[in-house]
A protein has these predicted regions:
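Structural motif
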Residues: 35, 58-60, 110, 125
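Short strand-edge motifs at loop-to-beta-strand transitions and within beta-strands
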Residues: 87-89
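N-terminal leader/pre-domain low-complexity segments
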Residues: 1-39, 60-62, 66-77
Length: 129
């Protein structure tokens, strides 16, 4: 059921992305043995336009790309394909995350977030008394 809800959420996000006022950046989420990695294409955004939060195993990415006509210049667009405005994307992780070691880096318009997993507790032998 959780998977079905995620698929539905992705479909809704794609539909809203085709609305001229909506913008949702493409994001990949993958997993290694030790961490989850999230990459988001955010061309034209700087660090001040991106907000990250992690709470209750949920990563939330918020951002805002300004409308190019907000500069005050009169612009006559011939074609507009790049969206603008605010976006919010959230991702929930099943494994526990070492929140104090989460790292984010923005290079060439690609945001990379590394979320290290909490290592499993070592097994121990329990003596029967």
């Amino acid at each position: 059921m959780h998977w079905e809800l995620r698929v539905l959420q992705q479909r809704l996000e794609r539909l809203s992305a085709h609305h001229p006022e909506a913008w949702a950046p493409p994001i990949d989420v993958y997993e290694t043995e030790k961490a989850f990695i999230v990459t988001a294409e955010l061309p034209g955004l700087n660090r001040d336009q991106i907000e990250l939060a992690f709470e209750d195993r949920r990563l939330t990415i918020r951002g805002h790309r300004s409308d190019r006509s907000a500069s005050g210049d009169v612009l006559r667009f011939h074609q507009v394909e790049r969206g603008h405005g605010s976006f919010v994307r959230s991702f929930e992780f099943a494994d526990k995350i070492e929140v104090e070691h989460v790292a984010a880096d923005l290079v060439d318009g690609v945001l990379t977030i590394t979320l290290p997993k909490v290592p499993p507790a070592p097994s121990r032998k329990i003596e029967v008394l």
